[in-house]
From Swiss-Prot:
This is Cysteine desulfurase. One of its GO terms (cellular component) is cytoplasm. Keywords: Cytoplasm, Lyase, Pyridoxal phosphate, Transferase. PROSITE patterns: AA_TRANSFER_CLASS_5. InterPro entries: Aminotrans_V_dom, Aminotrans_V_PyrdxlP_BS, Cys_dSase_SufS, PyrdxlP-dep_Trfase, PyrdxlP-dep_Trfase_major, PyrdxlP-dep_Trfase_small. The gene is sufS. One of its GO terms (biological process) is cysteine metabolic process. The lineage of its organism: Bacteria, Pseudomonadati, Pseudomonadota, Gammaproteobacteria, Enterobacterales. It is found in: Cytoplasm. Homodimer. Interacts with SufE and the SufBCD complex composed of SufB, SufC and SufD. The interaction with SufE is required to mediate the direct transfer of the sulfur atom from the S-sulfanylcysteine.
Length: 412
């Protein structure tokens, strides 16, 4: 299969517009990726001709819509190589997925005096829920620090895991630094360390950034949980996926109560809950979002996951080389990375640089990127972040470099 970025761009009409008199250069896909026509049209078709509430109706439209939603569950299981569709829980996004784990798994398995391990490179979505829970339960949160290259030193892990470590929760791909963590090796090492101390350790991987750049095989990774959002994968917002190992989901209590997640409700006899994954899907789901997610998976699969990765890696190599031509530009993170490039320009505030770039039609992200510990690590308040996607071109990178050089001249 031959990957053609020119052909891919035809699937994204938003990229044809001009911003401030310049062709749009969209380098903010790590925040949210643009949507291809096929995803938009599939959602529209469903709403126009097929929409109905799912799971509880016996009429034709409801039964058909239920089959479509459940087919996407099977599709996602296949896409990330889960063992069963029953290991796929639909959530609003990565943030809700991690909060679900914290409030269900965490309350069931983590006790006062226990500890968990997170890393210094985490998005706030994989920090705040654990601190909120720790305030209530009283467990310790241990932090795996970054090294000078923006990577994790695996030798340090042995000092963090002991017999009372219940969870290791870390990102697959840093949303700021582009660091690709060696997930399989980390998990293998962590499990070995826990086994040596007769501990019971589970592993959560935040796949929000990795899902659009890498093929994911949760069985090969040997993680217990893997979470990601649809809108990073060229799908709609408001829908995401929590993969959970079935034996764990079976043992976890529901987090939210309501319709659809029960077997029986009796004011006299009490409540019995549905089996996973439906136990964790209270209320009416984001039906159209699920349909759109299925269309997004169809789209990226049709392009070829290996081909996408090759295109993006070649583009990253090109971008890293070209950005070094900008004299006062400081890069953050490792030389080998995927998806995102964090930088600052001289002593200029990231907000000012981003505002100037916008005048040239270039969309990047500025700020702390919901990763304040990373900012603290590098002793800065904010960074600029350019991110790559399937529709990014070398011409986009060239435009960024030229604009940064102009800003250097303007701001001094």
């Amino acid at each position: 299969m031959t990957f053609s970025v020119k052909k891919v761009r035809q699937d994204f009409p938003v990229l044809t517009q001009q911003v401030n008199g310049h062709p749009l250069v969209y380098l903010d896909s790590a925040a949210s990726a643009q949507k291809p026509v096929s995803v938009i049209e599939r959602e529209s078709e469903f709403c126009l001709h097929q929409y109905a509430a799912v799971h509880r109706g016996i009429h034709t439209l409801s039964s058909a819509a239920t089959r479509m939603v459940e087919n996407v569950r099977y599709q996602i299981a296949q896409f990330i190589h889960a063992q069963s569709h029953e290991e796929i829980v639909f959530v609003k996004g990565t943030t809700e997925g991690i909060n679900l784990i914290a409030n269900s798994y965490g309350r069931k398995f983590i006790n006062n005096g226990d500890n968990i391990v997170i890393t210094e490179m985490e998005h706030h979505a994989n920090i705040v829920p654990w601190y909120m829970l720790a305030e209530q339960i009283g467990f310790e949160i241990r932090v795996w620090p970054l090294n000078e290259n923006g990577e994790l030193d695996q030798a340090i892990l042995a000092s963090l895991i002991d017999s009372r470590t219940k969870l290791l929760s870390f990102t697959h791909l840093s949303n700021v630094l582009g660091t690709v963590n060696p997930v399989r090796q980390i998990i293998k090492q962590a499990r070995k360390l826990a086994d040596e101390q007769e501990g019971r350790l589970h592993i959560l991987v935040d796949g929000a950034q990795a899902i659009m750049h890498k093929q994911i095989d949760v069985q090969d990774l040997d993680c217990d949980f893997y979470v990601f959002s649809s809108h990073k994968l060229y799908g709609p917002t408001g829908i995401g996926v929590l993969y959970g190992r079935k034996s764990l989901l079976d043992a976890m209590p529901p987090w939210e109560g309501g319709g659809a997640m029960i077997k029986q409700v009796s004011l006299q006899k009490g409540i019995t809950y549905a089996e996973p994954p439906w136990r964790f899907e209270a209320g009416t789901p984001n039906i159209t979002g699920i349909i759109g997610l299925g269309a997004a998976v169809d789209y990226v699969t049709s392009l070829g996951l290996d081909e996408i990765q090759q295109h993006e890696q070649a583009l990253m190599d090109y971008a890293m080389a070209r950005l070094k031509e900008v004299k006062t530009l400081k890069l953050y993170g490792p030389e080998q990375r995927q998806g995102v490039i964090a930088f600052n320009l001289g002593r200029h505030h990231a907000y000012d640089v981003g505002s100037f770039l916008d005048q040239y039609g270039i969309a990047i992200r500025t700020g702390h990127h919901c990763a304040l510990p990373v900012m603290e690590h590098y002793h800065v308040s904010s960074m600029c972040r350019a991110s790559l996607a399937i529709y990014t071109t070398q011409e986009d990178i060239d435009a960024l470099v030229v604009a940064l050089q102009r800003i250097e001249q303007l701001l001094g």
